[in-house]
Amino acid sequence: MSSSSNSDPSSSPDNTDFIPLKDNPKDTSSYINKKNPFVNDSFDSHDDSYLDNVNPFEYNVADDEDTISMTSDGVEFHNLGITETVDEQDKILSELQLAYPTVSRYSETLDKGLLNGDKTTKGDYTSLRRFRKPFLFDKLSPYFTHFFSEIYAAVLRVVGPPRANETPGRNLPFSPILRQIYNHPLYNIFIFVVIVLHAVLLMIRSDDPHDKSQTIDYLIIVIGILYTLEMLLKIYLFGFLYDGSSSFYDFINSYTKKTPRTMSYLRHSWNRVDFVAIVALWISVIGKKQQGIFRLFSMIACLRLTRLLNITRKTETILKSLKESSTPLVQVVSFNAFFGVMIAILGVQFFKASLNRQCVWLGDYGDQYLPTGQFCGGHWENGIKRAYLDKNGFPSNVNPRGFICAEKSVCRVVENPYSNTVSFDNFFNSLELIFVIMSSNGFTDIMYDIMDAEYFVSCLLFIISAYFLTLWLMSLVIAVVTSSFIDLQHSGKNQKEQKSVDKHLIRNKLCEKYLFYSNFIWISFIVAQFVTLCTQTYDQTSSTANRYLIFYACVDFLLAAEVILRFFAYLPDYRLFFRRYTNLVDIVLAVLNLVTLLPSIRKNPVAFGWLSIFAIARIYRCILLIPYTRKIAKLLFSNFKQLLNLMLFLVIVLFIASLCAVRLFQDLPNDGDSDDDAISFATTYESFLYMYQILTSENWTDVMFAIQARLAHLHLSWIPGAFFTLWFLFSNNVVLSMFIAVIQVNFAPSESDLKMEQLKMYLARLLRNYNPFQASLTLNALIKRNGSRKGKTVDESHYEWLYEDNIIKGFLRVTNIPPKEPLKPSLDTSPELSKYSLAKLSNNFKRFVMRDDPFSQAYFKRVIGIRWEKDMNLKTAAKDMQAAKAFVRIKQTEFLKNHPKYNDVFWVIKPSNRIRRFCQRLVMPGVNERYGGVEPYQWVYRVIQVFIYACILTAVIIECIATPIYERDHLLNDKQHAWFVWTEVAFATIFTIEAAIKIIADGFCITPNAYLRSTWNCIDFFVLVTLWINLYAVLTSHALLSRAFRAFKALRVLRLINLTQTSQRMFHDALISGFFKIFSAAVVSATLLIPFALWAKNVFGGLLYSCNDDNVLSASQCVLEYASTPNNWEVWAPRVWSNPPDYDFDRFPHALLALFEIASIEGWVDIMRSVMDITGFNNQPQTNASSGNAMFFVLFNLVSMIYILTLFIAIIISNYAERTGSAFFTAEQRAWLELRRKIKSMRPSKRPAIRPLGLRGLCYDFAVQKHGIWRRTFTGLYIVHLLFLLTIFYPCPIAYTYVRNSIFLILSICYTINICVKVYGLSFYYFFHSFWNMFDVVVTLGSLTCNIAILAKFENRSLTLLQTTLLVLVTVHLIPKFDNFDQLSKTVVASLPSIFSLIATWIVLYITFAIAFNQIFGLTKLGLNGGPNKNFRSIRNALVLLFTMTFGEGWNDVMHDYTISYPNCVNGDDFYNSDCGNKPWAYGLFIAWNIISMYIFVNMFITVVFDNFSYIHTKSSSFTNLQRNDFRQFKDSWAPFDPMVTGYIPKRNAVKFVLSLRGVYDFRIYRDEHTLRSIISKVQSKTGQQSVPMLENPLMGSEINLEALDQIIDTIDVNVVKERRNVLNSLCTEIMTLPGNVISFSNILMLVVLHKIVDHREAFPISDYIRRAYVLSELEKSIRMEKLLGLVETSIIRKTFLQHMEEKKKALENPFILLSEVSEILPETPIQEVLRQHNADPEQLLMSTRTPSVSDRSFSIVESTVPTIASGEGDDNHSVEDHLKVPTDNEPRRSPSLKEVLLRGSHSLHSNNDRTSFDIEAGFGTAESDFQFGGATEDINRIADRIDDYLDRDSFKG
């Protein structure tokens, strides 16, 4: 096949037909200059990372020659920087040895360079896209050429990824001509223009659907024809499903992903999208007026526009990350959907027919019928509670519950909300509401409606679902996307070359000083202007406005002059001035601010308000001046380009989604509700706003429910439900997670610094000796018998050993370390301060005013910090710590000598005072060790602490009971004898006595162990003071004083955090250690809120006023009264001209509060709709009169959502990761930690080791086979079971309910049979060892019993709910049936400890704030957002309301309800007679809870899940090849050694077990082909004896082929055998050093993995590595010593044996002794002694094992680095010092010297407990070594090395 071109392809050397491929299947790097920066040599299949290497608009003229290539005919080509990649489909062609000369897609010239390249990358073939340079470009600048290349590259990305052209197997008519058309650049440009035109036409049609709809429809049909022709052209050239390049069999196999893909049309994802869109387009054209279901196809046709997402390289990279995360994302979403389905089924059974009951007002005479919208469960009738009425008006047969309607109204069944589309009546509606819960927005209204219709406890299902589904499982979705995107960011970051930044200095020193010092002056002008803008109001007088204007003009001209002066300061290097971005920004701001002073702008308040942003933007200089904000801002904006690309991606996605929504929901019929009809998708702009609203999750359910209601009559309500749900899931959970990933990357350290950061953190832990919780013992400590903290001394030599160069080098994997490696671990969170910063000046002032206190923790930090600044390295870290402590102790002694009264309590009570010593015997010191005192009696102290804890718990319970309403009711009757008042007095007295004892024991504030030095004591003292003040106010009836201080009593609940150590640590990590970072994030957020608030005040100040009468047009008409119709009742009311009740922008504080609420993604839609209705000053708002104003809030909401919410999440994730150390873990270390967690959780198989026979053996197979027919059958039954559960609905016919219950009974019987089969096959013992089996028994028998009872007519509501719950629990068996679900479930379980500790801390805060809210607002009247259960009048209501505010659900509306004041409430003289709110307390408490719970703890929850999930999906480790089958194989090998499934085997069997392992765990020294039997069978002569002889004499009767034997021996690698023997020696020795006579399953698995698979140098964190290095060094010493002693013992035995033989010879030569008497006369030989000790013969000796006792000390990795499950999680439960401590011998023992051993022989080492047998097959020997190594270690090592060489040399001799 040939093609006509300028250069005949037949002239090529091979005279081979060329194929102009769109995807060249050969490497074309041969014709590209190697200096070309656009070439990437490591392209993967469909890898578009090369796009990151093409940096647009950074073009170097010098590189023009590298980007231009010439062909043989002189045609010039320009490099586009786009590689063409295809899969391995061309391997078939390469095997056929077909030549691949091709032409460029943009020229017919033969590219001979393709013949030279044959390099592939991972089996893929890549080339470089080029375009033919027109002749006109020679006249233009190369910059224009590069710019054109970037534009054309964008065109190619949108049109589609370049693919290969027709394959050699196709030869169709007209293909050359069509190929030329397809290869022409104008064709690509034309297709790009068509796609853009399609988007424009759709937007125009949506904005004007009536006038131009017919014309645009015709144009869209034309575009559809063009799309179809393009598709047919591709199909003709490439084939539809089969391209003909290979056999049809290979084509079928290509779908298995094991063989390369073909070039056919549908084998590429973008072509499949195009095909679906084109087919949907023609279906929508056929449909009549695009109504009904045809709307769906019209929407699908818009998917062709998704190609616009490839417009830039970065957006294409984002798509790539989404594609890479698609598989785990689908798995996680499926896992979440499974649990969502389970809860949806429960929702149907629990809450069916609950939302169709409302209170109906009947009127005074029963002649009215007005549904009130209040859900109910009964009504009052003549003072008696009655059940609700059914739809026919008859009473129901259920008990009244929930909200009881008032008199003259009834609770009656009506239609479900939103045209019967919102309910729990069937599975699909229930599943929709469950997803609403998972979205964490819009579910609280449904929850309170259910609580009104049912019982209060109904909220538990919503609370559990919200925490489990939303915070726990949905966090996995965020973790998948974030992990994938972070990995992509790191890969791109590693590929980028660091650009060198030239630091130019100003030559004139005077100018440099001027720039530095004058900066403060100019910033003061900026601050003054900013403050002035804040004080300016919209209603100021004209004279005031002129003064403000004059001031603004002066400041603007001064700052403009400052820019000019700054420019002259840079001279003569004026270019340096323009290289600084701040200078360029200041120039632009100066010019624009001068422009705003023009009269035409100044006199227009709207334009002046919008342009005031340029004056406000100068505040950035203040942000950069403060070190705190500058550091965070730099981290935040360090990846600013990536954030902009993400914003571009988000905008494009929003635009396409808006067009799709318009095509679906434009011109929908109204359902009659005016509120729902206001939601319209009539235009693209409206659709854009609604789609963005759903993205932010703010009231997104209102949009979905309203559209569903309008489509309900067409039975198409499922379309908006599915559409909006998918859009919410993609936009809110996927796209926004990418912003978190971008910001988080900025906070993460580089890969090269991770291990060094671990070292720094490790030293920081060593030096940190301050514990803020030391004042109180935890509950765990109180229940222990011995609670004294015994100091454990650590030998200094161990520290020296830890910091040896070889240890540090081994961890860092470097060969050279500087002699003094600077290491400055951070003991505090304060950043580095600049020389003239305010914080630095403040610290200096404090040091000048306050004297140094050597007893404070800050003093120790400062001392060690000075040492670090001078000279600090890894070796001297421990010595520096000890020196600093000694120095501080000396300073403390000197300080007390100089200030003898310092340790006297109140300068009176001396340390020797008896009362003080008595008090010291009762309590522990607040901080540090007690100086100059006595230690407390432990039991007395414990009793006191238990009593105090009991008092705290009792006080909390009383506070939950004695609410303000309860107190008011009792105080009105008897104020003097109210029991709760006197209990408060009693508790206050007890806590006062406790504080007094502590103060007398250790002092109040200035003594070494003062009371107020402890954080918790400060909180206790503050609570105690407020408690007495509140008691005084209550007893004296001081209302204002009582209300001001009564909330502080809730702080005592914080003492409950001390109940567990994990909650202590979690509280410390969340609120204390990360306080500074969170505060910094808050400051940075404020720098964003404040400028926007000021801008909003200038733009919208005074424009939100409106009249409550919609019929007036201006403020002048808003007078007198009008007929108001609340609840359809006409009432005359006065007209009022006012702002909205909860927000306005008239003052700066009001604007700041409004924007803070918007930043929490709450309430911004209402504010946006208000500003969209603005018509002008003093004019009545009109709907969408100023719709463009909405973009202000869209912009602010997007920026705040990205830079505030994601900033908080990223900082909290970073802080938690740094505290736990996971932030500095490498990929290998993360994988190891995950593997360690897996191993610790593994248990032996719960089944017999030997398969029974007969029928029981068959049952055994059914029980143990993972993929057998029996298991698959029951998996199918579980799926059928789940499908029948989905058929529960209301109203359901009784007959179908009976049939369904019968089916469930049959299934339960099948499950019971399955249990019986398992029990019979495994036996009771093994069956009940499994948790799943016990769970199966309980659930199956419970469901069977319930089914029988229900079918036997014993049905009631409680039994039905129990039956459904048990049936739903049966479906849990599907989780272990699928590997993905099983793995994700283990991820969830792995995070349980951290989650529970977080929840425990969270619950304490819940109770604290619930009591505070109840004490302050327990009597406040209900507002518009309140309800029967939505209030703070009881603790349970307060807890539920706090739960809703945790998810941001209407927290701002509730807050404004509790700011109510007089005259809208009753403000009585007494607290109990007032129902007003409290504005300071409302703002303080609500905002504090919003920040602590919503911003911190919710993100901590996500962080914990993310931290565990990242370990599961780590794929870059060297031991990820461990599969589930490998662990199963290990369990199978374990089973024969542990037949009773105890999880332990004796140590004497450990070596046999290790040698029995196969596969990846194989520890045999010689493999199967090199065993003795295998070698004998191969070397025996054919004429000799063919059977293998007995092992006692293997060569007897055989003829050996010595030549074959030599060949086999030559194949044995001596080094490999030596390495295997060393590994086996080390493993067995470490096993024997473990304490006890048995070893557990997890411990031996851990040791096997450590010795065989894991490289501790790469995989271990620093603490584990140090411990492991010590263990290995001790093992090496032990093994060397064993070899030495073995040699000595062998020598002695040989000498004894020779003496024995000599004596025997002499005895035989003696003629007076008979031969039979020789054995009786001669002494017993050492070998016979050994055999006698073991009661064995020589044959048994070969199989015997021994238990070497290398040392009485246990230094195994199992006991240190990897603790048992009971001990916790390594470093989390133990201090770092514990990892460094090596156990010492408790009992002294005799330690013979090496000289004694060598002179006296091995008899000096033997004892009665010595076991000297050894395993010949294992090839190692050990002996007891009870002496210290001392200084003879080097000699021993040299001797052992010689022994090794001798043994290795002799082992293979001959």
UniProtKB/Swiss-Prot annotation:
This is Calcium-channel protein cch1. Keywords: Calcium, Calcium channel, Calcium transport, Cell membrane, Glycoprotein, Ion channel, Ion transport, Membrane, Transmembrane, Transmembrane helix, Transport, Voltage-gated channel. The gene is cch1. Glycans are attached at N40, N310, N699, N786, N1058, N1184, N1356, N1508, N1773. It comes from the Eukaryota. One of its GO terms (biological process) is calcium ion import across plasma membrane. Pfam families: Ion_trans (PF00520). The chain crosses the membrane at residues 184-204, 220-240, 274-294, 328-348, 427-447, 461-481, 514-534, 549-569, 581-601, 606-626, 642-662, 723-743, 946-966, 980-1000, 1021-1041, 1075-1095, 1148-1168, 1193-1213, 1274-1294, 1302-1322, 1331-1351, 1358-1378, 1393-1413, 1486-1506. One of its GO terms (molecular function) is voltage-gated calcium channel activity. SUPFAM superfamilies: Voltage-gated potassium channels. Residues 1771-1790 have a biased composition (Basic and acidic residues). Voltage-gated, high-affinity calcium channel that functions together with yam8 to mediate calcium entry into cells. Required during conditions of environmental stress. PANTHER family: VOLTAGE-DEPENDENT CALCIUM CHANNEL TYPE A SUBUNIT ALPHA-1. It is found in: Cell membrane. GO terms for cellular component: voltage-gated calcium channel complex. Residues 1-15 have a biased composition (Low complexity). Interacts with yam8 to form a Ca(2+) influx channel. Belongs to the calcium channel alpha-1 subunit (TC 1.A.1.11) family. It is a multi-pass membrane protein. The keyword Transmembrane helix applies. InterPro entries: Ion_trans_dom, VDCC_alpha-1_subunit, VDCCAlpha1, Volt_channel_dom_sf. Residues 1-33, 1764-1792 are annotated as: Disordered.
